[in-house]
């Protein structure tokens, strides 16, 4: 669980590692454009959480997703989730992000809440 807290705190402060024209303050930014789900099963086959299987999926959009996307490059080659021209995908470990001209930036991450280990937070 300690690992989970460290990873979430790091993601909330991703702006500290991004090149930003504004002065870095070391303060967390609000994460207003994010959603989460506690579930059981796998990202592509989710069900209600159980006493033995509880996972957390987090989806982040907007500027925070762009900062994460920019931090985990380069683009994945020959990987696509849609037929949209201009789609870009990036991933590191269990964190993956996409950019679609029609929808902007979106990043996914997740954790197994029973073990604290990273887990994919989304699927195509």
Regions found by a protein language model. Name each.
Residues 30-93:
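Mature extracytoplasmic domains of secretory-pathway proteins
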Residues 9-17:
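Hydrophobic h-region of N-terminal signal peptides that target proteins for export
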Residues 98-124:
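Short, exposed beta-strand-loop hairpins at the edges of beta-sheets
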Residues 17-26:
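Cleaved targeting-peptide boundary
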Residues 1-5:
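Positively charged n-region of N-terminal signal peptides that target proteins for export
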